[in-house]
């Protein structure tokens, strides 16, 4: 049996800092972020199913969200302003991400690659599932901005404005429900939510 370095690589998600160009009151790594995105994506799928007639699989979507940034163990976390500086850079970076996804998948024993492919290869997942994960990813970035701003860190003011626009562009009934129901608490202190 051949050794696999797959999970050793995934364990390094905790070493990759998000928001690398920003001063943060509370630093965040890719592992923490992925778990929060999984929580939110799962909730968005449940909200869509229960409130807006969806037929999604919330558990599959949560799993997809857990792995959504896993290729960053090979690429690092490129800051959003750099990644989307212009369409050419964004297009080339997508190619780099795809190559990293395939490299990560190839680290698994062959008998498990088919099982992991839908979660590791961004082009393999259902479009609707991917959209929910993208929505959750944007919401989590927005919530991070709320937390930082609430702690007095104005470094995140511009990022929040940018995310206000992104959330408006991606707006769905389930996102609106989530944001109205859960987001205000992120601006409160522990005493206020206890």
UniProtKB/Swiss-Prot annotation:
* Residues reported to bind substrate: 18-19, 33, 69, 77-80, 137
Q: Which Pfam families match?
A: YfbR-like
UniProt subcellular location: Cytoplasm
Site Appears to be important in orienting the phosphate for catalysis: give positions: 18
Q: Which InterPro entries match?
A: HD/PDEase_dom (IPR003607), HD_domain (IPR006674), YfbR (IPR022971), YfbR/HDDC2 (IPR039356)
- Biological function: Catalyzes the strictly specific dephosphorylation of 2'-deoxyribonucleoside 5'-monophosphates.
Q: What quaternary structure, including any partners, is listed in this protein's UniProt entry?
A: Homodimer.
- Spell out the protein name for this chain: 5'-deoxynucleotidase VP0926
Q: Which organism is it from?
A: Vibrio parahaemolyticus serotype O3:K6 (strain RIMD 2210633)
Lineage of the species this protein comes from: Bacteria, Pseudomonadati, Pseudomonadota, Gammaproteobacteria, Vibrionales
């Amino acid at each position: 049996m051949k050794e696999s370095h797959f999970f050793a690589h995934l364990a390094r998600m905790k070493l990759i800092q998000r928001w690398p160009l920003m001063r943060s009151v509370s630093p965040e790594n890719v592992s923490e972020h992925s778990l929060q995105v999984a929580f939110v994506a799962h909730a968005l799928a449940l909200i869509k199913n229960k409130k807006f007639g969806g037929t999604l699989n919330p558990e599959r979507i949560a799993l997809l969200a857990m792995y959504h940034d896993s290729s960053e163990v090979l690429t690092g976390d490129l800051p959003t302003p750099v990644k989307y500086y212009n369409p050419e850079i964004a297009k080339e970076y997508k190619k780099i991400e795809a190559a990293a996804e395939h490299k990560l998948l190839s680290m698994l024993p062959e008998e498990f690659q088919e099982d992991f492919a839908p979660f590791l290869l961004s082009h393999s997942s259902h479009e609707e599932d991917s959209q929910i994960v993208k929505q959750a990813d944007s919401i989590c970035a927005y919530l991070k901005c709320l937390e930082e701003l609430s702690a007095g860190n104005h470094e995140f003011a511009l990022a929040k404005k940018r995310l206000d626009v992104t959330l408006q562009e991606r707006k769905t009934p389930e996102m609106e429900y989530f944001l109205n129901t859960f987001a205000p608490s992120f601006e409160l202190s522990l005493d206020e939510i206890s």
